[in-house]
């Protein structure tokens, strides 16, 4: 099969979704399929290996770490021309919730193709976290949805999300808690839960390597350093916990300067170490060597990619957002009692004390191996084709998409 991935962000930029795209692509290709990603161009690519020359890159505007683009007739023509020189696409897999989704749905409608949509983003929380004037942004977003998807009425996030759901053959959520959240918008069709996976072979290599000695426990925080990730809350809680441990931060982002400043204000510079944006393999190796991986955001994550990776290399996780724990093995999860800094500090303190008392290392979980998840994804692609044969795109997608 030739699968067309449509994403809001370039696959070679920093972020959990981008890691997921590349891993899905790699494992689908191992099984004989072809994958082409259509996404905005970016000046912030971190991995040359992810910059596939056969992908379709759209003109975009760079704002911080994110690329912004649109949809419409000009983009339709660009996308169709690019795909015309490739094998025919048999299924569209939208892995975005903004311009990537608009372009993917329009492409599927023009070519009468089955469409699967993995809803990765909690837009209601995510957009206000990265953009100023959220009310204005949402009004523009809703207007764009009406125009580019020929939707009759979009005035709320629920209507925005349902407009996609009504047109998709299959919906996927990356976690149980986010699937429930989407159903809360009034989506009545079944939502498949398919988490982001981890690379089996790389995990096995890392598990075979010995862990490095350390003077004290290492608490690792990986990801994009931005306001919605609340890394400064982690520093506050760590300071309050007053434990004999080190923090290793892997990642970069627009909030890095503020994070460094907060570390200095709390007089933690001797305990907090910033390693910057490094390769995904190096982050996984650091997770393997850590005593715990820490998740500090609240209500933002649609899944727990970094904590999925952590348990896959046998490393426990300290969770502030308790909803993420639903899909994790119980023995790996150490959850804050509530959303407060006090509760966060308490679970950090309890975990470090536990590490002093117990030397037992948990066996790595195999729950999130990408090879197994890819087999499930293939099944969903075939199911989407069957559904589409009975309910073609044009029956759910009115209007002339070239005219928008």
What role is predicted for each listed range?
Residues 140-170:
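Membrane-proximal helix-turn-helix segments that form the acceptor-binding/catalytic region
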Residues 169, 288-302:
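Acidic donor-binding loop of glycosyltransferase active sites
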Residues 172, 211-240, 248:
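Conserved donor-binding/catalytic core segment of Leloir-type glycosyltransferases
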Residues 177, 197:
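Carbohydrate-associated surface elements
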Residues 258-278:
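Nucleotide-activated donor-binding/catalytic signature segment of Leloir-type glycosyltransferases, i.e.
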Residues 307, 312, 316-319:
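Short hydrophobic beta-strand element within catalytic cores of glycosyltransferases
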Residues 321, 330-342, 349-355:
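Conserved acidic donor-binding segment of nucleotide-sugar-dependent glycosyltransferases
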Residues 353-392:
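A charged, aromatic-enriched C-terminal amphipathic alpha-helix characteristic of glycosyltransferases
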